[in-house]
Amino acid sequence: MIISESLKFLKKENKVLYWSGWFNAALFMLAFILFFVDDRQIMSINAWIKPMKFALSVLIYVWTFGWLLQYLPAKNKVSFISWGITLCMIVENIAIFFQAARGETSHYNISSALNASIFSTMGIFIGINSVFIFYTLILFFTEKINLDQASLFAWRAGLFLVLVGGAAGGMMVGNMAHTVGAPDGGPGLPFLNWSTVTGDLRIAHFFTLHGLQAIPLFSFLFASKTSKPMLYNIVFFVCYTGACVALHLFAMLGRPLFS
């Protein structure tokens, strides 16, 4: 019931990101079906697991952004950000699905001119997406936001963590791999495929990106019920960020988190 009401509200407030979310839900279902009818593997896992993961992640991302943008008073800026993010995510998913259909990896793949151009295009649009996130964070400091200070801090902190997660993603691009101490494609956790034999930078990347959901959710579900919500939000943010940094350093040492 809560989810249904939230989606109705999101549809009213931001149709662009509302339908963008449903588009990614459809992509997830498409990849889910293809998982059972196409047994080809890319780097030791089914070719359609990665498109599934990305479609689900983008779904969560765009609906979260649709929710937080309601607090910005300038609707023209909301529309600009919404369309920009939607376009960037469409390009990312097209690239990932196209490469999966070809039986090729999408990330760090420069084995041919086509593969290199696809990977470069993905990098460009992820960079543009990061600019939209940074712009939104600036607006959350400069615009008059109709939120209490504790909730406002939570959204600012979440946006900041997404940018940090993007920087961590940039490190993986610089490394041209997501594992440290062994080639990509080794044994990993089911579905997530996080390495169980060596360091994996994707773990910290995942949790940092989803700080956009974790910090505001903590604020809404727990901190807001206390007499000092700002203090609880700050403590949780520091602990959460510290854990993400620790996960990143652990991976940089080439140590698996799960084994």
Predicted segment positions?
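Early transmembrane hairpin module of multi-pass membrane proteins
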Residues: 5, 14-126, 204-215
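Structural signal for the C-terminal ends of transmembrane alpha-helices
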Residues: 65-72, 137-146, 219-226
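Interfacial segments of alpha-helical transmembrane regions
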Residues: 77-85, 144-165, 229-237
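Active-site acidic/histidine clusters and adjacent loop/turn architecture
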Residues: 126-135
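Transmembrane alpha-helix/helix-exit interface in multi-pass inner-membrane proteins
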Residues: 161-184
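Glycine/small-residue-rich hydrophobic helix-like segments
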Residues: 184-233
